[in-house]
């Protein structure tokens, strides 16, 4: 399988996001990236939008519903939101949407900070493998993977996608 170029996806996502926000009458949203890949995508997206807005970062490790099964990520860091959440229009950015559990955890954490006016979900990739009813408003590409395949994003400069075959990783 040939993977798309993240830089091309980001350019198209910037255009699509501007159109989405304009259609909804949103002119000054707050941008939040989900660590780690979502932060990288958010930084690239803000650059493509030529937008100097501050970027909030979320670490959803403590909010995940599979925390007791998978354990805690070894590099948990505090979330940093340099702006109010209450009443704001938010753009929540993640790298890869798979099960929807990371986005659910991010929404739970955001609502602990306040009640936003709206949340627009932006994802570089949607793997169309949702376990929860979560869909991005803006997506770079939708891919279908075999059960033993995963996508890894590396970055931040440059962003690169890698297809991993878990069946050969043993």
Swiss-Prot record:
Transferase keyword on record:
yes
Write out the residue ranges of the motif PRPP-binding.
90-102
The record ties this protein, via Gene3D superfamilies, to:
3.40.50.2020
Q: What is its EC number?
A: 2.4.2.9
The record's section on Pfam families has: Pribosyltran
Spell out the InterPro entries in the cross-references: PRibTrfase_dom (IPR000836), PRTase-like (IPR029057), PyrR (IPR023050), PyrR_bifunctional (IPR050137)
Query: Which domain of life does this protein belong to?
Result: Bacteria
Keywords annotated in UniProt: Glycosyltransferase, Transcription, Transcription regulation, Transferase
Q: Which reaction does it catalyse?
A: UMP + diphosphate = 5-phospho-alpha-D-ribose 1-diphosphate + uracil
Q: Which GO terms describe its biological process?
A: regulation of DNA-templated transcription
Q: Which GO terms describe its molecular function?
A: uracil phosphoribosyltransferase activity
- What SUPFAM superfamilies would the database entry show? PRTase-like
Functional note: Regulates the transcription of the pyrimidine nucleotide (pyr) operon in response to exogenous pyrimidines.
Q: Which family does it belong to?
A: Belongs to the purine/pyrimidine phosphoribosyltransferase family. PyrR subfamily.
UniProt xrefs under NCBIfam families: PRK05205.1-1
Stated name of the protein = Bifunctional protein PyrR
The lineage is: Bacteria, Pseudomonadati, Pseudomonadota, Gammaproteobacteria, Pseudomonadales
